[in-house]
Amino acid sequence: MPAILDKILRIGEGKILRQLEAIAQAVNAIEDDFVAMSDAELQGMTAEFKERLANGESLDDIMPEAFATVREAARRVIGLRPFDVQVMGAGALHMGNIAEMKTGEGKTLVAVLPSYLNALSGKGVHIVTVNDYLAKFQSEMMGRVHHFLGLTVGVILPEMRPDERRVAYNCDITYGTNNELGFDYLRDNMAGSIEECVQRGHNFAIVDEVDSILIDEARTPLIISGPTQDEVHWYAEFAKVARNLVRDEDYEVDEKKRTISVLEPGITKVEDHLGIENLYESANTPLISFLHNSIKAKELFHNDKEYVVLNGEVLIVDEHTGRMLAGRRYNDGLHQAIEAKEDVQVREEYQTLATVTLQNYFRLYDKLSGMTGTAMTEASEFDKIYKLGVVPIPTNKPMARKDQADLVYRTEEAKYEAVVEDIAERHEKGQPILVGTVSVEKSEHLSAKLKKRGIPHSVLNAKVHADEAKIVALAGHKGAVTVATNMAGRGTDIMLGGSVEFLADAELRKRGLEPAGETADEYQAEWPGTVERIKSQVANEHDEVRALGGLYVVGTERHESRRIDNQLRGRSGRQGDPGESRFYLSLQDELMRLFKSDWVDRVLQVLKIPDDVPIENKRVTSAIANAQGQVESQNFESRKNVLKYDDVMDRQRKVIYAERREVLEGKDLQDQIRTFIDDTVTGYVTGATEEFAEEWDLEALWTALRQIYPVGVDYRVLEEEAGGRANMDRDELIAVLQKDAHEAYDRREAEVGETVMRELERRVVLSVLDRKWREHLYEMDYLREGIYLRAYSQRDPLVEYQREGFEMFAAMMDGIKEESVGFLFNLEVQVEIEEEDEEEEEVLEPMRQPVPSFDQQGAMPQIRAKGLERPSQPTKLAYSAPSEDGDAEVKGATVTNADDEFAGVGRNDRCPCGSGKKFKQCHGRPGGPTGLTARVS
C-alpha cells in the first residue's frame, strides 16, 4: 500500500518542479539589478518589502525579489551564491513542502532564502537543527547574511536562561534543536505568569534533516517530569500523627468506598501536634493530603495483603494474581505514606508534568517545511501525518558516485576481516574512507581491529561526539579514516580536501575573532581573505583526492531503514565529485536474521564455501530489501499508532493550554467563576436528587454543599414552602441554591476587596488547573498501560482509550470547577500593603509545583496566608527526550538552600542573625547573604 501511495504522490512532481523552475528563472531575470545595487540599497530592500506587505502584497508577490536580495547578500557577505537548484529548493520550502536535496547540495544556504522571506511578516521563523552545535554554527554563519539585511537572529541553547531564550525567540529568525523548542513549549505551559513565557507563537518552521526529526524520533515523546511531592519529611511526620489518632474518635473509615474523613477532634490533635492554628488555612492546604494519605495507609493498606515489604522496598501485590508488581507504585503520595508507615526509605517519585510528541508539536506551526537528502522513501508518511509533500530537487551537477554490489559473508568475523583488508588497501593509496556502523559496540570493535592493524583513524559515536563537526568536516582529507555510527554526518558535509568554510571559521576563532559579538565586524572583514587563502590550499588536495577516486564509503551492516543506508552512501559524491560505496554484510547481522537467512547458510555449508569467500547474489540482495521494507512498515504502523493515542491527549492538551494561556494573559474570570458555581451546584443537586423527591437526602446534600460554600438557605424552609419533600422540584432547587451561592460569592468579594478577589481568582484557577492536569496525565498514563488488554474481550483498545479518556477529561474539568469554587470560598487570606520596597512579594499557590524560580515580583498588594511557615524543599524537574543516538536523555535542575543554618526559620520571623529584620528580608531573601543557589544534578 505505501508503495502505491508513493507512486500516486509522485504524479504531481513534474508540475511542482516546473513551478520551482519558474521561480528560479524569475530570480535570474532580475539578478543583474540587485548585483548593481550598493550595500545600502540592497539593505534598504528589507524596509521596502515590509512596507509592501503592509500595503497588501503577499509573500508570494515579493518572493522573486526577496530571493534575489538574499542571493546577492550571500555572495557579498559569505562568498556563496545560491545555485538555481538551491533557489528551487527555497521555493519548495516556502510553499510548505519537504525539499529532498542530496548531500552536499547546500541545504543550510537554501534555508536562508525562505527564512528571510517569511521573517518579513514579523511573526518569526524557527530553523530546527539536529544538534546544538549546528544550531549555533548556522545561526552565526548564515546569520551574517540576515544581519546584513537588517534582520535579527537568535539561537536557543541548553544552558540559556529564560530571559535569554525570550530574546532569542523575539528575533526574526531563531535557530534551535527540536528538543529545546519542544521543551520551551511545555515550560511555557507550566509558567506561573505571562512574563515567564519565552515563545511567541508557531508561525513557520524549517526542519533540517526532517526525516530524522519527524520520523526517526517521532515515537519518543518529550516529557517534563517532577516529584509528585517534594516534602519527603512530611510523610514521616504524618505517619507519627496517624499512629496517635483513634479510629471513630478522630476519624471515620468507609472500607467499602475505601475513603476516610477526619473529625473535629482529630483536626485539633493534628493542629496541636504541628503547632499550627488552623489546618485548613491556605498555607497549610498541602498538609491535608499528607494527613489523609497517612490515615489511608494505616487503615486501608496492610502488609502482606495489599503490599509486601521486601529488601526495604514496598511492593504492591496484585489482588487478582497475588504476584508482586515490581516497579509499580501507588500515586498521589499514597505509596510514600505506606513507606513512612513501614519505616523504610521514602522514595522520591517522578510523575509526568507535561508531555508532547514531536509529531503534535510540529503540527502546531501554521506552516511547516523541511529538508533532507532522503525523504522519498517516507513520502507517504509525511503526507499522511504532516500533510507535507516531498519534492525531489535536481542536483547541481550529475551524480558520479559508484554504488558497488553488497558482499555477504557467512560470519560476522569474516566480514570484519574483509572490511579491514579493504580499508588498509585504500588507505595505503591515500583515499579518504568513511566507515558506517550500526552501534557504539560495533564501532569500537572495528576500531580495535584497525588499531591492531596500525591504521590511524577517528571514531565518532555516542560516547565520542564532542568534536563531531570537526571530525566530519575533515573526513575528506587525503588518508583520513573515519569510523562512525549512523548518528554521524547529519548536517555537516564531507568535502574532498576539507571544508573551506569550517577551516576558515576555525582559523579566525583561533585568532580570537567571533562571527557575533564585539569582534563581528573584524571577523566579517577578515573572512573573504581567509576563505580565499584556504581555498587555494584545499584546491590542490581536492584535486589529488579526486584522482584517488573521491570518498570511499563502507557500510558494515544494513540498517532497518533504507533511508539511513542512503544517507550513508550520500556522504560520498557531492557536487559531482567522484566517489564509491559498498556494503559488507554477514548472515549473522541483525537484519539478515529478520528474513531468516538459515537457508543461505545451509546452502553455503553444503557447497563447502569458506567463511572468507563472499557471495554476490541478487536473491540475497532482494531479500534484504524486502526485510527492510517490512521493518519500515512496522515502524510506520508503530508511529501511526503512537500518534492515534497521542491525538486523544493532544485535543485535551490544547483545551487546557488555551485556557491556561487566557488566565496568564489576564482574562477576566468573573463570569467563568460564576459559571463554575452554577455547574458545581447543579452537579451536587443532580447527584443527590436522582431518586423520587420523597427519597431525596437533603441533609447529606446540604452537608456536602457546606464544604464548598457557606449555604445561606435552609432546606427545611424550602421543603415547607413546597408543601413537603415529595412536592419539591429539582430545577427550582437548583435555581435557589445557585442564587444563594452567587450572593455568598458577592459577600466574599466585598470581604476581601475586588482587586484582591480578581488576583485570587487567577491564582486559584491556575493552581487547581495545573494540579488536576498533572493528576490527569498520570491517570491517562495508567489507562494507556493496560488498555491493550481490552483486545482480549474483542474491544478496540483505541476506541476504549478514546471513550474512557474523554470521560476522565470531563471528570477532571468538573473537578477543576468544584475545587476552584471551594478554594475561592474557603481560603483564608490576609492582605498586607508592604512598607519596604525591597521586600519580596509572596505568591499564593497552595498546591502548584512551579518550575524553579528565584524571584517572583508583582505589583499587587500581598495576599498572605496565615499559619504554618514551611522551609523550602528541593524542586527537581527531569527532561526526557530522544537523544541523537535514540536513547532518552534525562536532566534535572535542583534548587536548594545554600546554608542549612537557618532551616526551620519562618519567613516572617525575625532573622536569627540579629539584624532585626524579618528573615525573608535578610538571610531568607533570594540573593541575600545565604539566598538560593541553583545546581544541575
UniProtKB/Swiss-Prot annotation:
Annotated compartments: Cell membrane; Cytoplasm
Cofactor note (record): May bind 1 zinc ion per subunit.
CDD domains linked to this entry: DEXDc_SecA, SF2_C_secA
GO MF entries: ATP binding; metal ion binding; protein-exporting ATPase activity
EC number assigned by the record: 7.4.2.8
Gene3D superfamilies assigned to the protein according to its UniProt record, in alphabetical order: Helical scaffold and wing domains of SecA (1.10.3060.10), P-loop containing nucleotide triphosphate hydrolases (3.40.50.300), SecA, preprotein cross-linking domain (3.90.1440.10)
Pfam families reported for this sequence: P-loop_SecA, SEC-C, SecA_DEAD, SecA_PP_bind, SecA_SW
Superkingdom of origin: Bacteria
Catalytic activity entry: ATP + H2O + cellular proteinSide 1 = ADP + phosphate + cellular proteinSide 2
Family, per entry: Belongs to the SecA family.
Subunit and partners: Monomer and homodimer. Part of the essential Sec protein translocation apparatus which comprises SecA, SecYEG and auxiliary proteins SecDF. Other proteins may also be involved.
Protein name: Protein translocase subunit SecA
Protein source organism: Nocardioides sp. (strain ATCC BAA-499 / JS614)
